[in-house]
């Protein structure tokens, strides 16, 4: 079963690699940053490991800035920054307790990595679980987990955790 989990992690990260900066925490090799992508906040994180086979496998980061200029690039009229963070966790058996610890870790790490301020539009934080078994309580907790947070009455954007 361990081999199936590793294959699932590799296939999932391969599909994210085109648009996301990937930082591996499971011993895998993090791909180098491509030209034009120079932001990688996940390297500052201390990884969440339950044991050798359970914990944070990788963090995928996506950053986008949209802006409008007037005649020159230095004359910026407006800008909007969008960020997405995917926390990929692996577990042999996902329990409600393990889910809550992973959820809290992903939320707190996502808040640390987010660049909140003027021009910030949104940050999406998504925990993704690859596991062998799931308790009913954990499945219910995963399905009902939604956290929304606004910054300065949405003037500095919002954070959506799902």
Report each predicted region and the residues it spans.
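N-terminal, charge-rich interaction modules
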Residues: 1-91
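Short secondary-structure junctions and interdomain/linker hinges
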Residues: 19, 23, 109-117, 149-152
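Short secondary-structure capping micro-motifs at structural edges
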Residues: 73-75, 106-117, 144-145
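A short, structural micro-pattern
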Residues: 80-82, 121-122, 161
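Structural motif
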Residues: 88-93, 129-133
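Active-site-adjacent loop/helix micro-motif of nuclease/hydrolase catalytic cores
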Residues: 93-112, 136-140
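Nucleic-acid nuclease catalytic cores
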Residues: 116-143
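Charged, structured surface patches that assemble and position nucleic-acid processing machinery
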Residues: 145-162
């Amino acid at each position: 079963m361990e081999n199936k989990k590793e294959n699932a992690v590799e296939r999932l990260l391969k599909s994210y690699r085109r648009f996301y900066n990937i930082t591996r925490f499971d011993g895998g090799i993090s791909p180098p940053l491509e030209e034009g992508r120079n932001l990688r906040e996940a390297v500052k994180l201390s990884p969440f490991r339950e044991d050798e086979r359970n914990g944070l496998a990788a963090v995928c980061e996506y950053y986008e800035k949209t802006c409008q200029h007037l005649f020159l690039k230095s004359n910026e009229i407006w800008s909007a920054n969008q960020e997405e963070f995917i926390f990929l966790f692996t577990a042999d058996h996902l329990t409600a307790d393990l889910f809550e610890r992973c959820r809290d870790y992903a939320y707190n790490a996502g808040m640390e990595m987010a660049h909140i301020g003027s021009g910030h539009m949104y940050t999406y934080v998504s925990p993704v679980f690859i596991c062998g078994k799931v308790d009913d309580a954990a499945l219910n907790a995963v399905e009902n987990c939604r956290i929304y947070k606004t910054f300065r009455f949405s003037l500095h954007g919002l954070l959506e955790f799902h």
